[in-house]
Amino acid sequence: MKTTTRIIISLVGALLLLVLSYAQFNSPKPGPLGNEKKIIATADRLKLSPKQHVSYDDSIVMIDVHYDKTLLPVYDSTGYCLGTTPITDRGKILALLRQLQQSNYRYIIMDVFFEQGDVTPYDSALFALIDDMDRIIIPIHNFARQNSLIPIEKTGLADYETTKKESSFLKFPYIVGSTASIPLKMYQQLGPNHSTIQRHSGLFYTDAGHLCRRSVFLVMDMAKMLTEYDGEDNYYIANADRYTLGYDALGMPPDTNEMAFPLLDTGSYDGKYVIIGDFEDDVHNTYRGSQPGPLILFNAFLALLHGQHHVSILFLLILYVIYTILFWILLGKQKLKDSLVRGIRNPVVKRLTATIVSLISYTLLLEVVCVITYWRTGKVYDLITIGAIFTILSNIYHYTYDVVQIQKNKLL
């Protein structure tokens, strides 16, 4: 192959793979081989964990609704009562929000779902109060209908995608179609001016002029890990305050009309992120073990606040250079391993180098890039899939090259 042709193919091929890489960064689904989790595991083994961000442990108050349920009758289309279903006690939610309205809270994440058709005597007052409050967000889900009385501007998506290969939570999508997630709506209100994720030309996303991605692999140990583990993938809340809704926050013991002394007053919420949700049942498998859903949402917000979704132009330029070099090697007469030992004259050194190089592949080289990037920036990018593509292209090219050479030799 002529040098000029080889250069052009290398430059164009590298550009195409760079665009493919960015598209994969934006995908709401984890890598096809669970590559992101592999990158974290490799970095942990090598003790190359990035520096953690400023702790938010003393800036949150967690309200657990797990023990505050009420039974709601369920009827069929004829009006026959089929039984009951437990829902979060909306009377206690209303009482808590009235208390919060008197405080100077920073933001409320109320990870409590109000499904269409579930009706209680408190709904009118509760939803009117939610509409009247500032800096409060409630989840919606693609698989269920939200109560139509909830103002749409006070809701955000709280879903994520998995694959057959990887069923655990890995990546959080900040925007799906035109629907913004809970963390993104929080970021729009609390982040720097004009903070949001905007789509351009069907592929590219920006945040206030910065190239970014709409989906991020969450580094769950952000903020000094709001949860810790007992060694068996069971979590417990660490370095943060968690209270039950009825007993601790409202002073209302369960199954009784008696009043107790609440542990919290209006001043307890001043300047705090108030996270309301079920910390016992609403748990999800992650690469760090089980995590409660409300804290996943908060971690996703912190990732935005610290620019984890931003994609550095310098990083893309470095990646483009790496891809170009790998394409140049791929299009050579020799395979990657042979190219790396070419030019070594000392037979002992050459043999030793060949042994080491025999373990090297395109996938391994790009995995090293992933680990170094995570170590230096705290951001996880899946380049291992691109490494697999390089390997496939290399095998196809050299197989075709060998076939052509054999045919030429036969003609001679």
Q: Where are each of the predicted segments found?
A:
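Juxtamembrane interface at the cytosolic side of transmembrane helices
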Residues: 325-364, 369-375, 401-406
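Flexible inter-domain connectors and hinge/loop segments
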Residues: 2-323, 391-412
